[in-house]
């Protein structure tokens, strides 16, 4: 049986490849996301991207943050072999908007901001407000779970090497 720490470090590349693939999907192919959420409007790179290049003797870390920050430095880092370790995502569905950061090494979600809900005007309304908040949290989590499940199936298929990986490389080189 694998030690948890060994397994964690051995497979963290999957989460980082997932985030890199997700950025590619955000830039080039958002239409297929509608199959996971019929009300899907958009998925955008938010206000923070962290990339890391571990191919040299020392790890190089690049952080791009701020509203309206240019992502060209991130593309340049991808060209040099970096992988995304954190990605802030803006998810829009119907008239609703979520924003959160996804960490590659563990796929932890942090700073999840959900759409605002109605306030409870009486004690009877509290249960409805709580259930609405649970639904809104779950909707963002379900999207990430479905995207990751799709990614893992794609990653172990022949399509990854024959089609998807070359498309990602082409996107990185042409940006």
Residues covered by each model-derived region:
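Intrinsically disordered, low-complexity, charge-rich terminal extensions
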Residues: 1-175
């Amino acid at each position: 049986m694998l030690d948890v720490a060994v397994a964690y470090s051995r497979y963290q590349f999957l989460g980082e490849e997932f985030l890199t693939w997700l950025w590619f999907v955000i830039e080039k192919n958002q239409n297929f996301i509608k199959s996971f959420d019929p009300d899907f409007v958009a998925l955008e790179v938010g206000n923070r991207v962290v990339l890391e290049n571990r191919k040299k003797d020392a790890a190089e870390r690049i952080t791009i943050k701020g509203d309206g920050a240019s992502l060209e430095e991130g593309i340049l880092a991808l060209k040099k072999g970096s992988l995304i370790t954190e990605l802030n995502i803006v998810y829009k569905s119907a008239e609703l908007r979520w924003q959160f950061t996804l960490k590659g090494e563990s796929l932890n979600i942090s700073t999840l901001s959900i759409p605002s809900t109605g306030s409870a005007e009486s004690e009877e309304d509290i249960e409805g407000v709580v259930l609405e908040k649970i639904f809104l949290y779950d909707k963002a989590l379900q999207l990430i779970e479905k995207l990751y499940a799709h990614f893992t199936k794609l990653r172990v298929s022949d399509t990854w090497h024959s089609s998807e990986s070359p498309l990602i490389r082409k996107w990185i080189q042409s940006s």
